[in-house]
Amino acid sequence: RALSINQRAMQTVGHNIANQGTEGFSRQHVRSGTSAPDPTGVGGGADAQPTSRVYDKFVQRKILQETPRSGMFKSRGEFLQKIEIIFSETEGNGLHKALNEFWNSWSQLSNQPESEPARMQVKVQSDVLASRFRGMHSQLKGLRNEINGRLVATINQVNELGQKVAELNKQINSFEGGGQRIANDMRDARNQAIEDLSELVDVNSFEDPNGRTTVIIGRDWTLVEGNNRYQLEGKMKGGELGMLNIDGVSTNDNRRDLTRIFRE
């Protein structure tokens, strides 16, 4: 038995070394425990316990809490920077200058209402201002389309990761059904999928007694429950200036507007 335990420990060490660069992998550890004595009371030596993961639940929970905030600030900062560029006055031809010259042309016309050059200047500055508004509108529309495109990509990623977690729930539950084995690598893969989810949206998760993880996004919408995965759908709605709205679709096609989760 001692030889068997040592052999298993060596295999586990090799597994740890082989996966040191695997994203989400947790180091594994073989523990030995006292074997039950025989009927005469003679000790049975040692037995290997199920291989466990060296894993800190507190650290994992903090990662899930902080990751979406980091992603939100990064994304928001990126788009605010693009909006700032659209409204920029650094090149001397921004909206502020166009407005000033437009009102100045009207002021000159009010002082010389019969002047043909003054009238022409009003027309020229009106055209310049209108052109500036059209250009800004086009840029903002392009930015809106970029945001919608990213939201569509995010929806697809969330759905794929939710499906992955549900499938791993099923596999883990099947593997650990007898209570004698722990699906360490599958659990690592599931944790990594949930961590990847946290980069896209605010996530909370908890594990039930059967080893299956429930995943909640936002404050209270269930994405994964046991072996079941629900999904997100994006669609355009009127009155939203062309912005994509996101629905959570659960059992019996029950829908809930989750757009705020991705805009907060």
Kindly label every feature range from the protein language model:
Residues 1-264:
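Structural signature of extracellular appendage/secretion-system components
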